[in-house]
Amino acid sequence: VSAAAVAGSLGSSLLLMVAVLPQTKADSIHNRTKLIEVATALSSVRLQLIETVETDTAVKLFAARNMPQASDAQRSERQAAIQLALRASAEVPLEVMRLCARGLELAASLAALCARAASGDMHLAVALLQAGFDGARSNLEGKLSSFIDASYVTSVVDEIARLSDKTTAASRAAASLLGVPPA
């Protein structure tokens, strides 16, 4: 999931670069104000994505799996610890998905304001954020079969679907504002 977070962070960084370019579609006070708002939000998304790279949940899972299993009570404690560690490990890709989805929403806002000359960077940024989202989603979906709590799995699957819809809409909005990428 670290690679997905790095991809999303790179996409956010590119968008941030575009947001602070001196040339815009319409050099108005309103546009400049909106660009500052978008840049501030992108900076936050980028930093949060970088923080997820440093989140290490594997240690908790390894520790839980190495707990003693001699008695029924120990096996029960071990299973509970494993499930708790799995939830913690599922939260990281879910957060990467949320942040990449937010980055894509900001890309759509930025696409309406940025200069046409930045469209190549915008397309690449959108692709990187989409790759980050897809990588985190794949990582998370691979973990779902390990959960015992069906209601938790259902809530995660519902959030995956919601974020996927949000991401698709934001990517389409950005692409429609940018036009077809150069061949």
Language-model features, listed with the residues they occupy:
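Amphipathic alpha-helix face/heptad-repeat signature
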Residues: 6-10, 38, 45-52, 85, ...
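Long, C-terminal-biased catalytic regions of enzyme "large/alpha" subunits
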Residues: 36-41, 61, 127, 134, ...
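Inter-helical turn/loop segments and adjacent helix faces that build the functional surface
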Residues: 22-25, 29, 110-119, 143-155
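Amphipathic alpha-helical interface segments
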Residues: 56-127, 131, 143
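Disorder-to-helix initiation segments
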Residues: 3, 27-38, 75-82, 149, ...
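Conserved phosphate/anionic-ligand binding catalytic regions in large, soluble enzymes, centered on
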Residues: 2-16, 118-136
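C-terminal auxiliary extensions adjacent to catalytic cores
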Residues: 136-147, 154-183
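A structural-propensity feature for long, helix-poor, extended segments
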Residues: 25-68
